Amino acid sequence: MSNSKPLSLTDAVTTWYMKKLKSKPIQTKALTSATLSFISSVVAQKFIEKKKINWNAVVKFTVWGLISSPLVHYWHIILDRLFKNIKDKYQSWGKLIVDQLVFAPFINIAFYSVLAILDGKPKSILFKLYFDLFPTLKASWKVWPLAQLINFRFVPSHLRVLFGNLVGFCWGIYLSILATKKRN
């Protein structure tokens, strides 16, 4: 008979998730991101905008979550390699600067491009970027630098995408509202 007590539901789910993260990191991160994107879109529409759920928008935002997570996964690998020989105290700041000046514009361009394609309006990409990219970046720079500094400084590398997903849940609500307003 074992002296260990049975795992709580939280412990069991955490253990299962960590195993999946190790055995299938990209799929696990993509499905996590898609799930949180789905939930954030529903929350934004139903509880913040207080309107009937536009399931078409929810599906598009969920697809975005599925696509974006692998990009973020590989971005973190690139950052880790770029800054591997830098002292710890400078590493986080270096990653933050490169992340916000290179990846933030890239991921937001990708966001608007993917949504335009999913809307069946690929010709509107440049128009959307012209009007929406800088306001979105300005808004993101109010949230993501602090979140990413915490992420780069304190979160183990295998959990950084998950941490970003959790911050992104709130950010996703904002983006979902923004994307829905821009489409209407």
Curated annotation (Swiss-Prot):
Keywords: Membrane, Signal, Transmembrane, Transmembrane helix. InterPro entries: Mpv17_PMP22 (IPR007248). The keyword Transcription does not apply. It is found in: Membrane. The chain crosses the membrane at residues 58-78, 97-117, 159-179. It is a multi-pass membrane protein. GO terms for cellular component: cytoplasm; peroxisomal membrane. Its main location: membrane. It holds the Pfam family Mpv17_PMP22. Residues 1-44 form the signal peptide. It comes from the Eukaryota. Belongs to the peroxisomal membrane protein PXMP2/4 family. PANTHER family: PEROXISOMAL MEMBRANE PROTEIN 2, PXMP2 MPV17, PXMP2_4 FAMILY PROTEIN 3. This is PXMP2/4 family protein 3. It comes from Dictyostelium discoideum. The lineage of its organism: Eukaryota, Amoebozoa, Evosea, Eumycetozoa, Dictyostelia.
